[in-house]
From Swiss-Prot:
Name listed for the protein in its UniProt record: Elongation factor Tu
Gene name tied to this protein: tuf
PROSITE patterns referenced in this protein's UniProt entry, alphabetically: G_TR_1 (PS00301), G_TR_2 (PS51722)
Task of the protein: GTP hydrolase that promotes the GTP-dependent binding of aminoacyl-tRNA to the A-site of ribosomes during protein biosynthesis.
Sites where the protein binds GTP: 19-26, 81-85, 136-139
HAMAP family named in the record: EF_Tu_B
Organism taxonomic ancestry: Bacteria, Pseudomonadati, Verrucomicrobiota, Methylacidiphilae, Methylacidiphilales
């Protein structure tokens, strides 16, 4: 029992497999669990256990995702694998599975294919910070020069999309052979895990980031003043600290004179806490749902941005028809809807349900915004799309 408690001390990292259909993403995921299970660091997961991923809902969108856990000597990994290409797009855009790093699987027999490109581009757009490459099926390639060519091609492709292609670790192997227990190929799986350990840094924990709390409700407490409530998204806050209220209206500064949780006073609020903050000198009408309380100078309001968006199919509860330039839905950021106008890219006539598309949005009021932030697109309270901010314009 004591051993179990000790294991939880390892730092936690979220990863996932990406790459073209049939290049071996799920086989690799399974192989990692098989090889690490021999060292007592994972539970074996067979290919079909992973492939029959259960459906999940994220922001009103149904996604099939398999979640696998394993450990290296240094770390604890949560690994996501999606059966279908559309699931990947939805997963990456909604941030259902936020990745600290991705394992790009490329078949050595085929080289990079269209979805290889699409997944690298998506990783860049949604802010996946690190990629390691597993060059799979090398047992099917006899020609060493051909292998080198494929490796060069992959590095070139990564460079094209703004990843450091020359520095990224590329591990060659065969997931299937490793699954079959071939010791030579099992070694490659351990090399891959080692590359992940060394190349993907441990992310900064939400607690260590600058304080931010989206406002969900505003109350007036007789004789005390205005209280805003919400769930702390990141960072920590102490009583009597100065904060900014950002978004929708001009930014204002105030001091948090009291922090309450479950009707008790707290000295410090931290990421994950549901709290009420008493704000000095702020009237109930000065603040509203949709604004954020943040550490001064750490987040700014914006109204114009580029986004990568997945538009729901009719079967997913989305629109039944295409939309055109000038489309004006609601954009749901954190806790509130803001109306915005869509400008499609040059040469794009319309957007169909089921499309994965990039366009510009101009909101009618500014929102506290950061690159890689997620949002939903809604019409009359119904989700019709999911998006991520790829670039802030103004």
């Amino acid at each position: 029992m004591a051993k179990e408690a000790f294991l939880r001390k390892k730092p936690h990292i979220n990863v996932g497999t990406i790459g073209h259909v049939d290049h071996g993403k799920t086989t690799l995921t399974s192989a990692i669990t098989y090889v690490l299970a021999k060292k007592g660091l994972a539970q074996k997961m067979a290919y079909d256990q992973i492939d029959k991923a259960p459906e999940e809902k994220e922001r009103g969108i149904t996604i099939n995702t398999a979640h696998v856990e394993y450990e290296s000597d240094k770390r604890h990994y949560a690994h996501v694998d999606c059966p279908g290409h559309a699931d990947y797009i939805k997963n990456m855009i909604t941030g259902a599975a936020q990745m600290d790093g991705a394992i790009l699987v490329v078949s050595a027999a085929d080289g990079p294919m269209p979805q290889t490109r699409e997944h690298i581009l998506l990783a860049r757009q949604v802010g996946v910070p690190y990629i390691v490459v597993f060059l799979n099926k090398v047992d099917m390639v006899d020609d060493k020069e051909l292998l080198e060519l494929v490796e060069l091609e992959v590095r070139e492709l990564l460079n094209q999309y703004g990843f450091p292609g020359d520095k990224i670790p590329i591990i060659k192997g065969s997931a299937l052979k490793a699954l079959e227990g071939d010791p030579e190929y099992e070694k490659n799986i351990l090399e891959l895990v080692e590359a992940m350990d060394n190349y993907i840094p441990i992310p900064e924990r939400p607690k260590d980031q600058p304080f931010l709390m989206p406002i969900e409700d505003v109350f007036n407490i007789e004789g005390r003043g205005t209280v805003v409530t919400g769930r702390v998204e990141r960072g920590t806050l102490k009583r009597m600290e100065e904060v900014e209220i950002v978004g929708i209206r001009p930014t204002t500064k105030t001091v948090v004179t009291d922090i309450e949780m479950f009707r008790k006073t707290l000295d410090t609020a931290e990421a994950g806490d549901n709290v009420g903050l008493l704000l000095r000198g702020i009237k109930k009408d000065d603040v509203e749902r949709g604004q954020v309380v943040a550490k001064p100078g750490t987040i700014t309001p914006h109204h114009k941005f580029n986004a990568q968006v997945y538009v729901l199919k009719k079967e997913e509860g989305g629109r039944h028809t295409a939309f055109f330039n000038g489309y004006r839905p609601q954009f749901f950021f954190r806790t509130t809807d803001v109306t915005g106008t869509v400008t499609l890219k040059e040469g794009v006539e319309m957007v169909m349900p089921g499309d994965n598309v990039e366009f510009m949005v101009e909101l009618i009021s500014p929102i506290a915004m950061e690159k890689s932030m997620r949002f939903a697109i809604r019409e009359g309270g119904k989700t019709v799309g999911a998006g991520v901010v790829t670039e802030i314009i103004e």
